[in-house]
Amino acid sequence: AASDVYKRQSVDCVVIGFDGEQLKVLLVKRAGEDNGEVYHDMKLPGSLIYMDEDLDEAAQRVLYELTGLKNVNLMQFKAFGSKNRTSNPKDVRWLERAMQSRVERIVTIAYLSMVKIDRTLDKNLDEHQACWIALKEVKTLAFDHNLIIKEAMTYIRQFVEFNPSMLFELLSRKFTAAQLRTLFELVYDKVVDVRNFHKKIAMMEYVCLLYTSPSPRDGATS
């Protein structure tokens, strides 16, 4: 109920996936009417929190309600509290209609999850109006959600510098060196030197190299 909602605090979830070729982000469709015109755009899975739940509970609930995903590993990575977050009248009107309550300034806590894109994950997305969009194809989103995604990628790059194992959340247990190299190139948005990259893989304690015929260069497993 709207009376149970804490109107100044929300959570937004950035769920990043990898399909073997490109990085994707999980978005939900948004439809509304503004000044008599119907519009359709997209947003991150997010909403206001309830008075009787903590932030982590809210993030799990919102992600499940909007996408059907549950038991996903979510971690807080940043708070977004710009005074201009709710300055767009279209966003404010949409949120007030959705929550059936007047909305003022809102601070959001952003959560990040890295997941494998597979059929099990995707089985409930359509009925929840959720879908995977390639990062390079993301258009203008609601509120400051483009900025939140940008900051999520910055966080991932900084984290991976010290702990590359984070990226293995995006891969199956067995993967090729080429797939891992592609993933690094997408995350850092630059071409990776093949020879140096293979040396880097060989030094990773949590990677077991599997050489398969006829080509021994691409076999690897985590």
Label the model's feature ranges:
Residues 3-42:
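N-terminal strand-loop-strand
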Residues 11, 57-60, 64-119, 159-167, ...:
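Active-site segment of metal-dependent pyrophosphate-handling enzymes
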Residues 44-52, 169-170:
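Short histidine-centered catalytic/ligand-binding loop motif
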Residues 108-117, 121-158, 170-178, 196-197, ...:
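NUDIX/MutT-family hydrolases
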Residues 179-187:
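DNA-recognition alpha helix
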Residues 1-9, 211-218:
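Conserved small/polar residues in nucleotide/adenosyl-binding loops
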Residues 163-174, 187:
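Conserved helix-adjacent loop modules within structured domains
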Residues 188-213, 217, 222:
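C-terminal accessory regions appended to core domains
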